[in-house]
Design a protein with these regions (language model features):
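Alpha-helical transmembrane segments of multi-pass secondary-active solute transporters
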Residues: 37, 68-69, 131, 161-166
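Intracellular helix-loop hinge segments at the cytoplasmic ends of transmembrane helices
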Residues: 24, 111-122
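Multi-pass alpha-helical transporter architecture, strongest
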Residues: 159-187
Length: 187
């Protein structure tokens, strides 16, 4: 449960920041007047809506292994976010496309991640209630700690260091997904 929560904290850090704190900071440091923070929020969200619909329509019909799916989507969501942040100064349209792809892969795994506890062996309603209570509490505590630390890094070490911290902090998600049990057997 704690591993699941810690991983979720890293996921939330990547997931919430481009919708709240990050766009304004990126706009201040992009050196590109074409970059608009509201379009970063919009493109991540639109990609996310499409990703959620994709996941709901496609993944529930397929019997696939969860860990490889979550790892691949985790790498892609972080990779596309990193590319979007790299291109924001030189090619704003490409950065918006990258943010949208990040949103797609971010949100398309969300239903799979949140349903994983239901697929664990010997799971019952009492265990699920306790697990999700701990999961949400620790997940958001980790996110809050990362967000606070990110703001300190931004204020004391600068923009580039804060972006590196943001991406590295998000990697905790992938690291902890590697420790999850696989709930679907290999065919």
């Amino acid at each position: 449960i704690y591993v699941f929560s810690l991983g979720f904290g890293g996921f939330l850090f990547l997931y919430v920041m481009p919708l709240v704190s990050l766009p304004r900071v990126v706009a201040e440091h992009a050196h590109n007047s074409s970059f608009k923070p509201e379009f970063m929020i919009l493109t991540v969200t639109l990609g996310g809506i499409i990703g959620t619909l994709f996941s709901l329509m496609v993944t529930r019909k397929l019997n696939f292994r969860r860990k490889p799916f979550l790892i691949a989507h985790g790498v892609l969501m972080i990779g596309f976010m990193a590319l979007g942040l790299i291109f924001v100064s030189t090619n704003v349209v490409l950065s918006y496309v990258m943010f949208s792809l990040s949103g797609f892969f971010m949100y398309s795994q969300y239903p799979v991640y949140l349903n994983l506890p239901y697929e664990l062996p010997n799971m019952n309603s009492q265990r699920l209630t306790i697990m999700f209570g701990i999961f949400w509490a620790f997940g958001y505590a980790i996110y809050t700690l990362f967000n606070f630390t990110w703001s300190l890094v931004l204020n004391h070490l600068g923009y580039n260091s804060s972006i590196i911290f943001y991406l590295l902090g998000s990697l905790i998600y992938i690291i902890f997904v590697f420790t999850f049990p696989e709930t679907r057997s290999k065919k």
